[in-house]
Curated annotation (Swiss-Prot):
SUPFAM superfamilies: Ribonuclease PH domain 2-like, Ribosomal protein S5 domain 2-like. GO terms for biological process: rRNA catabolic process; rRNA processing; tRNA processing. It comes from Ruegeria pomeroyi (strain ATCC 700808 / DSM 15171 / DSS-3) (Silicibacter pomeroyi). This is Ribonuclease PH. PANTHER family: EXOSOME COMPLEX COMPONENT, EXOSOME COMPLEX COMPONENT RRP41.
Amino acid sequence: MRPSGRDLSEMRPVSIETGFTKHAEGSCLIKMGDTHVLCTATIEDRVPPFIKGSGLGWVTAEYGMLPRATNTRMRREAASGKQGGRTVEIQRLIGRALRAGVDRVALGERQITVDCDVIQADGGTRCASITGGWVALRLAVNKLMKAGDVISDPLVDPVAAVSCGIYAGQPVLDLDYPEDSEAGVDGNFIMTGSGKLIEVQMSAEGSVFNRAQLDQLLGLAEKGVGELVAAQMAATA
């Protein structure tokens, strides 16, 4: 039995509220159970120096957590003068994931920065950030298209992510924090709306796993991502 009482293949309730902030070109508040993330997308008419003059666009991301997003207060990273390794890893992951669904030629020589700020954390913050980040990106690109600044849609496929793991010896979908902290195997699956894999992060946290278990987790991830993409489509329709 899962602590939440959910079935093994049951997602937490998902909601996506768009237009959550008024200044950003795209924004949403995504809730996956008790994990809540504010995602905004900002369009800038510049690109990093390494692609300047190439005609290619760029999508990047930044990630952070509010001090009281967790059970005990975390010190703001700004107060220590540097980002932690976990933060850097996650924001690079978000940027990589979102770029996988973008035609950078069609985007043109501009940059879109997706900011993901965790308001409340209960497991799966990077997955919620990727899923909500794509919605914010979609809304920002819609504005570019409406203004005629891009000719064809640069977003070629939705991108979403979900966690899967082995908890109490059973493969489970969309781990919350109590499950994540005790899982024998923990993984994150990032996929496109068409079912292609972008990235898989899997690790043995207390027990090893075999190919059959990996296939079970992949099947759960496909189900979960399908539900998340449906939520993305409904939010951006």
